[in-house]
A protein has these predicted regions:
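Alpha/beta enzyme core
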Residues: 12-17, 21-24, 34-186, 194-215
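Alpha/beta catalytic cores of nucleotide-metabolism and tRNA/nucleoside-modifying enzymes
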Residues: 166-267
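Short amphipathic alpha-helical segments at helix-loop
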Residues: 28, 155, 217-221
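Contiguous N-terminal and early-domain "leader" segments and peripheral loops that mark the onset or edge
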Residues: 1-3, 129, 142, 227
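N-terminal capping/small domains of soluble enzymes
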Residues: 1-37, 41-48, 232, 251-267
Length: 267
């Protein structure tokens, strides 16, 4: 499980609910760097103290995208629902902007993560740091050279920049750049067990799912989430059996087009 900085429940409460379960999976904290480094460091310290096992640093979303569906639907968070882990964070004081300046380019982007920020984060925590939002092989190579514990190929489900490359397109390029030096996970568009198998065939070490779990939660609470995960697992097992894979290690690129490796220029 990966808990977001923006979660509406405290990171400590989630850890207390998850960690005692003997059948649980990993518990990671998805971190958004805040303009106030002291506040960011306090978040990291809270995650460590609560028992989180890794930090997932989002590197590609210094601002929210243009979410037309939400606007058309008139979506608003219900009263009382908000990012409780950011309570007490003071917003940066806006400075006066000239006619040729932008609140985005002369404000928010000054706080976007840099390679130096990643090195700083690694220096203040004992937890492994994974980078989420990597789509370009050059960035993947740089991240590994800086000691990233893993990469997550992600385009935020197309909600941040709707014309960003699909994760299925970016994944094999990133895997090639990493050359096995770190695990490469992927999210975005995982809806069926067959999608999981395709991701593994493209080189993913694991997949992450977001919206399907939320759909299950909205329909049937915790039982709905468990049902969604069970469906994905059952579909994956059937897909593996029908493609002759007895283990996930046997899911290679050959499953997708009959060749062991992508053709030159295919990715």
């Amino acid at each position: 499980m990966v808990l977001s900085t923006q979660a509406s429940v405290s990171l400590e409460s989630v850890a207390q609910a998850v960690l005692p379960d003997p059948g649980r999976g990993p518990l990671w904290f998805q971190l958004y760097l805040q303009p106030d480094r002291g506040f960011t460091q306090a978040l990291v310290q809270r995650a460590e103290a609560a028992g989180y096992e890794a930090l997932v640093l989002t590197v590609d979303a210094p601002t929210s995208g243009v979410r037309d569906r939400e606007r058309r639907a008139g979506f608003r968070l219900p009263p009382g629902v908000g990012p409780v882990n950011l309570a007490g964070l003071q917003a940066p004081t806006p400075s006066a902007l000239g006619p040729s300046q932008s609140a985005l380019f002369d404000g928010l982007l000054h706080h976007a993560p840099t390679w130096d920020d990643i090195a700083w984060l690694q220096s203040i925590t004992r937890l492994p740091v994974l980078l989420k939002g990597v789509l370009h092989p050059a960035d993947a190579g740089q991240a590994v050279s800086l000691g990233a514990a893993g990469l997550i190929v992600s385009n935020h489900g197309g909600r941040t920049l709707d014309t960003a490359p699909s994760t299925a397109t970016a994944l094999p390029r990133v895997v090639q750049a990493v050359q096995g030096k770190a695990p490469v996970l992927v999210d975005g568009g995982i809806r069926r067990g067959t999608d999981v198998l395709k991701a593994m065939a493209l080189g993913a070490s694991a997949v992450l799912v977001g919206r399907p779990a939320v759909w299950g939660l909205a329909n049937a609470g915790a039982a709905g989430v468990a049902h969604v995960l069970r469906l994905l697992r059952d579909e994956l097992e059937v897909a593996m059996a029908l493609t002759g894979c007895s283990t996930l290690a046997e899911a290679t690129y050959a499953l997708l087009d009959g060749h062991d490796e992508p053709a030159a220029g295919a990715i």
